[in-house]
Structure formats: structure tokens, C-alpha cells
């Protein structure tokens, strides 16, 4: 738009061209629409002082609108006075614009007074008064006005009441008004339908479906805003199928950008891959994606290749520099563990907001790169970006050295965030992970507010730092605290881990009883912890009972039972459990599954079963073999006396995972068990090169020599331990006599 002419030029143009009021009003309209409200006010003021041209009702209405945009109380009052003096208040649009002005200024008293001065208020006057009353907090007055209205047959009046109640938090009243409106035969419009649908959530699905029927009956299924509201309603009610059905039934011509955005965002929120298919449909419909489209799509990308394509399209359409999209791009790459790409996006941004910095710190936290996260925070501090609780929460979640952790805590105090419960909890966890359980406990005790996360942090902190009884004591304090806080699945799983570390079957059984009493057995995490607890405490039958009683089983559930059988030497049961898992087909085995079942085969001597399972890993399940898998199979072959095959497998493992000490140790142990001197010497030489200061290699080799009757070599090997400076750890007993 052209810049407004200066005051002198405007007046001369008016004089030279015999400008009429129509031209003046056009000029005022142009300035107002282009956002040049100050220039519009200057033009009106100078025209008002000009004797050759007098503003009419339209000029005054435009001036009032301009004052409303600027929230200019003084000028608005002056125009109001001019309208009174010039007799222009009799025009409805002047009076209505004044009502809008006082609503914007928050002056309900002046608005009421002005409304009372209107002889015959129209629908706009009534709706402005009602909307202002709700907006400015006088809800009782709004209902008083509504009840006294002579006629209430206009849909705009009802929409104002329904919207006002909704925005004031009176959702039930909005629904009642909607129903009353329907009973009275007032025809709903698309605005009313969209408003009432936006209030439907999971608890009001039936009402939402009733409104859906009314929409179809009233013929508003062709209105984009109503269709969008319907789709949103079904997503809010967690009925994804119906949301998608509404989208599919909507005419292609009705679907707009918002429609696709609503569906994509809804599906992404439920982690549904169909969001990408809808995105493709949007592109095929020649609709340009918005920044919100890219944010939703990137949030649902689970494939790195697809993520790169979406990022490329964002660049092509010019959205890559939008902060919202850039932040989503960084988060997406972090989810793929492509932290280099996330860093590249971060560095390419000329403007970074707080969310951008927090996202980068969070990415480094996810990558366990504490120093890099701290480096980003220092840059942020240097340029003067003020951190928030999310910044420090991400920083504290990284692996920080103690001195850095203390520095971060000092910054938290400096920015006045230490009182926030999220920060307090993060500090407790950070100090616990750093082995500073006393500092963590001190922070916990000094915390004025404690929630369940606080208790979980200190209980697990004591457990992981080797103080299970102190953790148990804190759990007792949680149950006895004045503020009633019920333990969750994480709390109880930690408590069951404490039972394992203290070998307390009685406490574990009591915890199991607590779980049943409080109806928390449905939590898969607790079921898994119970299976592990019972097996570790020696009662595998109880582990099996818990497993069979679980309504939902994940891969950890199956792994826990397989490990339990392996721990108790019941290899055949472990293999049978693995086969049952395969037959059911509900859960896909992971790397831990194969580690557990191969270990069970090893201890039970099930060579054929172990080889069959090992060979199926990559081909049938796509699980990459790791050091645990090779170690277990080498141990299995070694225990069975197949040392040649075990040696061959070790060499194969070197090509796959490199030379790993654990795998060689499995072969070395087999050599010792079967007295294979030749192979044992070869493996011992290799291990001595890799672990020069480990005395156990020498001890094992000495035992092999002794088993072969080579006492001299055995003694020389023992003496070699002292020569290299290694020392065998002394045996001891933890039992007191």
C-alpha cells in the first residue's frame, strides 16, 4: 500500500480535486485497512478543522474504528463529542462503532450508558453489549440483558451468549443455551455449530454425535469451518476412526488447508502413520501446506528418509526459516538420532527464540552430549537470552560433572527458578546420578512443595546409590505424608527393585498385595517388576502366575519370564516361552529377548535350539547380533565341548562386531573347563595383550596348566602376576560370625 500523504499534501489534494466526502471516506478506509491508523486520525482531525468539508456519519464511524484499533481513549472521546454536537449519533452504525470502541477500551460503564441512549438498538448493538459484558467479567448483567430482550429470534444473539459462556468457562450453560435455542426453533448457523463442537471432549461424545446429526440435517456439512470443527471434536473425544470418516465423507471442494491441518495434527497426536498419507493427499489437491502443516507432519515422521523429504519440501516452499518449523525440524532429526542434522538446522537460523535454544539443548541431552548442551547454554547466556525452567530441566537431565552441576544450580538461583517444583525435582535427580545422594536428600528436605515426581526421584536416588533401606524409609514417609500422594507404577517398580537388592521376599509379597488392593496390577511396568522380583527371590512359580495374570504383555514381560527360567536353570521352559511368544505374534522379540533365550540355552546345554535361534535373528527378525549374543553362543558351544566351532564363531564375530574381550573370555572359560591347553594358551596371549593388568587371565591360564599337570608352568604364570604389577582381588565374606 502507498504510504499516506503528509498532512499538507492531503489537504491540498482535497482542495485541488474538489474532493467529496466519498473520496475522504475512501482515503480513511484505505489508511485504516493498511494499518496506518495514526495517519488516518491526523487526516480526520485536519479535515474536521477545515471549514470547506464536514465529516459525515461514515467519516465519524471510520474515525471511531481507528481510535478503537489504537485504543486511543482521548481521541475516541473527542470523536464521540463531535458526533453528539453534529447530531450524528442517530445513525446506528455510529452508535454501534462507539459501543465497539468502549468494549475495546474495557469501559463497560460507558458502553452501558451509550447503549441506553440508543432509541432502537439493532442486533449488532445487543450482541456487542452481551459480548462486552462477558469479556469484561459482568456475566450476571449479560444474562440480565438477555432475559429482558424483547426479541431473541436472531441467531447472532444466541451465538453471543453461547460464545460468552464458553469463554467464561460455563460450558454446561453453553450447551443448555444451544438446546434451548433448538427447542425454540431458532436456526443454527455455521458459527454456532463450530462453537458448540469445540466444547465437546471425551465425556460428551454422545452430545457431539447429536450435533453432528443436526449439522447434516441443517445442510452445513458443506461448510469448511463446521467440518473442521467436527473432525476436531472426534479427535478430542479420542475417536480417531470417526474423525477420519468425516474427512473421507467431506466433499473435496469443501476441504481447505485447515481441514488437512486438523486431520494431520490429530493423527500425528495419536502417533498414526496415516498422517503422512493425508499430507500426500493435501499436496495432490494442490493445497499449499502451512507452517502448522509441517510442524504436525514432522512430528509424525518415523522414517529418516521421509523426514528428509519433508524438510526438503519445507525449504522449497520457503518455510524452513519459520522459527516454528525450524524447531520442529530439529526435534524431528533428534528423534532419528541425527544430531548433526539438528545442529546444522540450528546454526543456519538467523533468528532463534527460546524454544530453539531449548530444543538444541534437549537434542544434546538425548545424545548424552552434556558438554555440547552446556556449550549451547553458554552461547545463549552470552547473547542475553533468558532461560526458563525447560532450559534448566534439559541441562540437568544431561550427564554433567559435579562442578558444572553446581554452576548450573547457581544460575538457577540467580534467575529465581529454584522454587519451581520441576527444577527442584531435576536437581534432585541430577545430584543422585552424580553420586551426591546427600545433596539430593538435602534438596528434597528443603523443597517446600513435593509431588510424586519428587518422591520418585529421591527413592530411586537412594536405591541406585546403594542405599536401599533409606529408599524404603522414604517410601514409608510417602505413604504417611500429610498431603495424600498415591505411588504410581514407577514408584512401585522401584520399590520392587529394592526388594530384590535386599533379598526381601516378604516385602515383595507385601508390595504385590498393595498393588492388588489399589488396582494397579493392570500397569505392565509393575507386572514386569513383579516377575523379576519373584524370580530373583527364588520363587519362579510366582513369576509365572504373575505373567499369566497380566492382561497386557510387552516385550519386557516376555523377556523377564525367559530370564527367570534362565536364572533358575530351566532352559527348556525358557525356549518354550520364546516359541509361545513367536506363535502368538503379538510382540516382536528384541535384542534383549535373544540374549535371555541364548543364555538359557547355554546354561541348559541346548546346542541345537541355541544355534537355530541364533541363526534366525537377522534373517527372520531383523535383529542385529551384538556382543552378548556372540558371547552366549560361544559359551554354549564351549560348554558342550565344541571348541573348534566356538573358535570359528569368535572369528566370525570379529568381522561383525570387531574383536571384543567378552567373546574371547567365553572361549577362554571353555578352554579352562575342558583343559584345552593349546587353544587356551593362544586365547590367553590375546587377552593379555588386551587386558594387561587383569590378573584373572593369569589365574585362569595357571589353572589350565595345573589341570594338564604342568606344575612348573602353572607356578611361573602365578609369579608373572606380581611381575606385571597386577594383584588378584582377595576373597572375603560378607557374613559376620
Curated annotation (Swiss-Prot):
InterPro entries with a match to the protein in the record: E_motif, Pentatricopeptide_rpt, PPR_At4g14850-like_plant, TPR-like_helical_dom_sf
Keyword Repeat applies: yes
Region of interest (Type E motif), residue spans: 663-737
UniProtKB keywords: Repeat
Ranges occupied by PPR repeats: 20-55, 56-90, 91-121, 122-152, 154-188, 189-222, 223-253, 256-289, 290-321, 322-352, 353-387, 388-418, 420-454, 455-485, 488-522, 523-553, 554-588, 590-620, 626-656
Matching PANTHER family: PENTATRICOPEPTIDE REPEAT-CONTAINING PROTEIN, TETRATRICOPEPTIDE-LIKE HELICAL DOMAIN-CONTAINING PROTEIN-RELATED
Name of the featured protein: Pentatricopeptide repeat-containing protein At3g49740
Amino acid at each position: 500500500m502507498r504510504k499516506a500523504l503528509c498532512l499538507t499534501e492531503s489537504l491540498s489534494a482535497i482542495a485541488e480535486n474538489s474532493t467529496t466526502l466519498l473520496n475522504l471516506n475512501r482515503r480513511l478506509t484505505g489508511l485504516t485497512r493498511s494499518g496506518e491508523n495514526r495517519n488516518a486520525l491526523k487526516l480526520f482531525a485536519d479535515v474536521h478543522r477545515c471549514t470547506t468539508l464536514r465529516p459525515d456519519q461514515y467519516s465519524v464511524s471510520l474515525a471511531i474504528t481507528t481510535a478503537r484499533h489504537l485504543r486511543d481513549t482521548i481521541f475516541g472521546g473527542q470523536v464521540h463529542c463531535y458526533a453528539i454536537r453534529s447530531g450524528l449519533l442517530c445513525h446506528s452504525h455510529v452508535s454501534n462503532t462507539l459501543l465497539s470502541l468502549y468494549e475495546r477500551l474495557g469501559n463497560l460503564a460507558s458502553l452501558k450508558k451509550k447503549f441506553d441512549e440508543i432509541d432502537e438498538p439493532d442486533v449488532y448493538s445487543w450482541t456487542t453489549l452481551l459480548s462486552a459484558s462477558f469479556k469484561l467479567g459482568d456475566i450476571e448483567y449479560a444474562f440480565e440483558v438477555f432475559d429482558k430482550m424483547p426479541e431473541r429470534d436472531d441467531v447472532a444473539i444466541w451465538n453471543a451468549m453461547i460464545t460468552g459462556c464458553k469463554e467464561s468457562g460455563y460450558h454446561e450453560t453453553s450447551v443448555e443455551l444451544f438446546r434451548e435455542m433448538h427447542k425454540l426453533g431458532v436456526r443454527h448457523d455455521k458459527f454456532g455449530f463450530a462453537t458448540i463442537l469445540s466444547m465437546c471432549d471425551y465425556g460428551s461424545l454422545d452430545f457431539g454425535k447429536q450435533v453432528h446429526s443436526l449439522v447434516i440435517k441443517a445442510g452445513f456439512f458443506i461448510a469448511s469451518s463446521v467440518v473442521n470443527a467436527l473432525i476436531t471434536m472426534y479427535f478430542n473425544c479420542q475417536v480417531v476412526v470417526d474423525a477420519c470418516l468425516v474427512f473421507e465423507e467431506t466433499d473435496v471442494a469443501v476441504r481447505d488447508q485447515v481441514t488437512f491441518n486438523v486431520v494431520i495434527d490429530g493423527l500425528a497426536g495419536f502417533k498414526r502413520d496415516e498422517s503422512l498419507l493425508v499430507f500426500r493427499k493435501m499436496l495432490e489437491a494442490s493445497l499449499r501446506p502451512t507452517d502448522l502443516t509441517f510442524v504436525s507432519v514432522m512430528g509424525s515422521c518415523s522414517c529418516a528418509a521421509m523426514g528428509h523429504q519433508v524438510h526438503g519440501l519445507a525449504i522449497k516452499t520457503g518455510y524452513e526459516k519459520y522459527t516454528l518449523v525450524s524447531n520442529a525440524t530439529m526435534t524431528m532429526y533428534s528423534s532419528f538420532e541425527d544430531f548433526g542434522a539438528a545442529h546444522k538446522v540450528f546454526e543456519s537460523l538467523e533468528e532463534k527464540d527460546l524454544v530453539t535454544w531449548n530444543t538444541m539443548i534437549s537434542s544434546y541431552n538425548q545424545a548424552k552430549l552434556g558438554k555440547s548442551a552446556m556449550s549451547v547454554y553458554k552461547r545463549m547466556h552470552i547473547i542475553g537470552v533468558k532461560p526458563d525452567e525447560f532450559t534448566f530441566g534439559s541441562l540437568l537431565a544431561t550427564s554433567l560433572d559435579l562442578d558444572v552441576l553446581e554452576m548450573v544450580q547457581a544460575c538457577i538461583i540467580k534467575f529465581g527458578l529454584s522454587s519451581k517444583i520441576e527444577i527442584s525435582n531435576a536437581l534432585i535427580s541430577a545430584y543422585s546420578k552424580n553420586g551426591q545422594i546427600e545433596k539430593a536428600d538435602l534438596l528434597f528436605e528443603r523443597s517446600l512443595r513435593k509431588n510424586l515426581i519428587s518422591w520418585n526421584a529421591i527413592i530411586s536416588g537412594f536405591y541406585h546409590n546403594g542405599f536401599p533401606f533409606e529408599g524404603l524409609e522414604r517410601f514409608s514417609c510417602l505413604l504417611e505424608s500429610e498431603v495424600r500422594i498415591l505411588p504410581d507404577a514407577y514408584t512401585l517398580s522401584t520399590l520392587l527393585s529394592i526388594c530384590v537388592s535386599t533379598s526381601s521376599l516378604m516385602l515383595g509379597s507385601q508390595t504385590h498385595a498393595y498393588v492388588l488392593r489399589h488396582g494397579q496390577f493392570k500397569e505392565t511396568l509393575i507386572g514386569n517388576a513383579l516377575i523379576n522380583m519373584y524370580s530373583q527371590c527364588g520363587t519362579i512359580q510366582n513369576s509365572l502366575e504373575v505373567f499369566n495374570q497380566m492382561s497386557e504383555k510387552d516385550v519386557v514381560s516376555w523377556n523377564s519370564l525367559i530370564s527367570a527360567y534362565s536364572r533358575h536353570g530351566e532352559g527348556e521352559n525358557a525356549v518354550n516361552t520364546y516359541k509361545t511368544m513367536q506363535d502368538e505374534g503379538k510382540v516382536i522379540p528384541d535384542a534383549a529377548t535373544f540374549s535371555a533365550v541364548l543364555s538359557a540355552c547355554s546354561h541348559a546345554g541346548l546346542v541345537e535350539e541355541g544355534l537355530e535361534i541364533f541363526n534366525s535373528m537377522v534373517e527372520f527378525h531383523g535383529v542385529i547380533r551384538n556382543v552378548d549374543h556372540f558371547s552366549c553362543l560361544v559359551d554354549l558351544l564351549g560348554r558342550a565341548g565344541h571348541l573348534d566351532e566356538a573358535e570359528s564363531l569368535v572369528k566370525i564375530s570379529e568381522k561383525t562386531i570387531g574383536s571384543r574381550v567378552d567373546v574371547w573370555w567365553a572361549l577362554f572359560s571353555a578352554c579352562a573347563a575342558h583343559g584345552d591347553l593349546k587353544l587356551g594358551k593362544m586365547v590367553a596371549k590375546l587377552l593379555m595383550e588386551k587386558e594387561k593388568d587383569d590378573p584373572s587371565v593369569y589365574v585362569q591360564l595357571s589353572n589350565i596348566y595345573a589341570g594338564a599337570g604342568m606344575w612348573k608352568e602353572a607356578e611361573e604364570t602365578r609369579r608373572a602376576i606380581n611381575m606385571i604389577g597386577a594383584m588378584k582381588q582377595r576373597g572375603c565374606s560378607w557374613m559376620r560370625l
